[in-house]
Amino acid sequence: FLYAFRSIIRSRGGKMKKTVYHGSDHIIERPKYGYGKIYNDYGVGFYCTENQNMAKEWGVSADKNGYANRYEIECDGLKVLNLNMRDYTMLHWLTILLENREFDASTPLAAEAKEYLLQNFHLDYEKADIIIGYRADDSYFSFAADFINGAISYRQLSNAMRLGKLGQQFVLKSRRAFERLEFTGYEIASVQEWYKRKASRDHMARRQYFDLERNRRQRGDLYITTILDEEMKPDDPRLR
């Protein structure tokens, strides 16, 4: 499959360097390859963001300060799967979620949709050194589940993923990527400031979803039932 490097900044003699941040409840100078939760969005990996403020939100809990660990990584020669590029659709991202996150396909429609997406929109993402794509926390995963169950359209799902401006994840998957990562410092995220921001962002996304998106059907909207009935494939222009 295709790899895209357009989001990587060239610097220092033409090499591709990127600054990324990881939110955590502790300082992590040397992330461990192969360590982490298997049910994360893109499987086991080291989950980062290019947005330091977002890392601070990810690092805090309701009663504990967090840390935004800062790193530099040289991406020259690494295979980067950027799911935001035009080569891919929202269904490619959703299929990766279905392969990793626990999803209860309790209805016949959801079960059929899951099987169809896995057969037709699967990517060999495990071959990538780095994956760039949406982050699906609990709120956003529920939006994806609504699409699979036929409650919202493809257009509504695409719009919903931008609610709250949750941002993109920059996920290190391979040993090669881990070896390129250089710890350059950290900033403390105080629970008083950043947990409030975190809760506010999630609340805003949910409110906008139910107020603006979930009940705003448009004529011609594309639903999962149509995708299944017409056996739509990744090259269908309606998915772009």
Indicate residue ranges for each PLM-predicted region.
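ADP-ribose/NAD+-binding catalytic cleft of ART/PARP-like enzymes
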Residues: 2-42, 237
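Conserved NAD+-utilizing ADP-ribose enzyme module
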Residues: 15, 62-64, 75-240
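Short, flexible loop/turn elements at secondary-structure junctions
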Residues: 25-26, 52, 75-77
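Extended catalytic/binding region for NAD+/ADP-ribose chemistry, centered on the ART fold
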Residues: 37-62
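Compact nucleic-acid interaction/catalytic patches
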Residues: 67
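A glycine-rich, hydrophobic loop/mini-helix early in the fold
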Residues: 70
